[in-house]
Each structure stands twice: as structure tokens, then as C-alpha cells.
Swiss-Prot record:
Subunit structure as annotated in this protein's UniProt entry: Forms heterodimers with BZIP1, BZIP9, BZIP10, BZIP25 and BZIP63. Interacts with ADA2B.
PROSITE patterns for this protein: BZIP, BZIP_BASIC
Subcellular locations according to the entry: Nucleus
GO biological process, one term: sucrose induced translational repression
Induction notes from the record: By light. Induced by hypoosmolarity. Repressed by sucrose (at protein level).
Keywords (A to Z) from UniProt: DNA-binding, Nucleus, Stress response, Transcription, Transcription regulation
Designated name of the protein: bZIP transcription factor 11
Region span, Disordered: 1-47
Low complexity biased stretches: 1-21
Gene (name only): BZIP11
Length: 159
């Protein structure tokens, strides 16, 4: 009998050992499946992140292109306005110079008119030595002088 009890014990140990092995195999397979699923989710998450970043890069490239185009257009407008301003400044200088010349002429004519009244009909310029004509101080003739363009000869500009 002794032999039968020891045989039963060893078969029980083998059976329990076999069920433990089976249980360990199941756990191992379950862990492998879980790890595979986790790795698959991780790959999908990385792929989604990569797709999102690629979309963001494309969006930023498009936005950058729009900004560069806008800056280029703005630069062109700036250069156009700067050129127009340069022309207007030159015209302003020219008109200021013309105004100063006209004011000088008026001042000269006014001083000549005042001197004529004081000199009793003689010209204020002693070098001329001629009697002053009312042509230069007559208001009707003044409009003729004022409407003439001011021109400088090329010799007058050389020092």
C-alpha cells in the first residue's frame, strides 16, 4: 500500500505541477498579448503624433509663405511711397526756392517803389542813371513779371 500512496503523491505533484505550468504558460501568453497590444497602441500613438506634427509643419510652412509674401508686398509699397516722398521733397524744395525768389523780387520792387517816391522820379540805382519808368512799379504790369518762370543760365551756377 505504501507503494500506491507514494505513486499517488507523485502523480498529484505532477498534476499540480502541470497545472502550474499551464497556468504559467497562460500568464506568459496573456502578458505577451498585453505587451503586443501595448506596443501596437504605442506605435499608433507615435504615428498619430508624427502625423499631427507633420500637419503642423505644413501649416507653419504655409503661414510662413504668406508672411513672406506679405512682407514682400509691404516692402514694395514702402519703396513706392519712399520714391514718391523723394519726388515730393524735391518739388517742395523747388517751390520754396521759387517762393523765396519771388519774395526777393517783390521786396526789390517795393524798395524801388519807396525809393522812387523819395527820389522824385529818379531811379534808386545810381549805376543806371536813368529815370524810373512807371512800368516797373505799375500794378497792372506786375502780373506779367510774376507769371514768368525763373530760369538760371548754366553760367550763373558756376562759381
Amino acid at each position: 500500500m505504501e507503494s500506491s500512496s507514494s505513486g499517488t503523491t507523485s502523480s498529484t505533484i505532477q498534476t499540480s505541477s502541470g497545472s502550474e505550468e499551464s497556468l504559467m504558460e497562460q500568464r506568459k501568453r496573456k502578458r505577451m498579448l498585453s505587451n503586443r497590444e501595448s506596443a501596437r497602441r504605442s506605435r499608433m500613438k507615435k504615428q498619430k503624433l508624427l502625423d499631427d506634427l507633420t500637419a503642423q509643419v505644413n501649416h507653419l510652412k504655409k503661414e510662413n509663405t504668406e508672411i513672406v509674401t506679405s512682407v514682400s508686398i509691404t516692402t514694395q509699397h514702402y519703396l513706392t511711397v519712399e520714391a514718391e516722398n523723394s519726388v515730393l521733397r524735391a518739388q517742395l524744395d523747388e517751390l520754396n526756392h521759387r517762393l523765396q525768389s519771388l519774395n526777393d523780387i517783390i521786396e526789390f520792387l517795393d524798395s524801388s517803389n519807396n525809393n522812387n517816391n523819395n527820389n522824385m522820379g529818379m531811379c534808386s540805382n545810381p549805376l543806371v542813371g536813368l529815370e524810373c519808368d512807371d512800368f516797373f512799379v505799375n500794378q497792372m504790369n506786375m502780373s506779367y513779371i510774376m507769371n514768368q518762370p525763373l530760369m538760371a543760365s548754366s553760367d550763373a551756377l558756376m562759381y
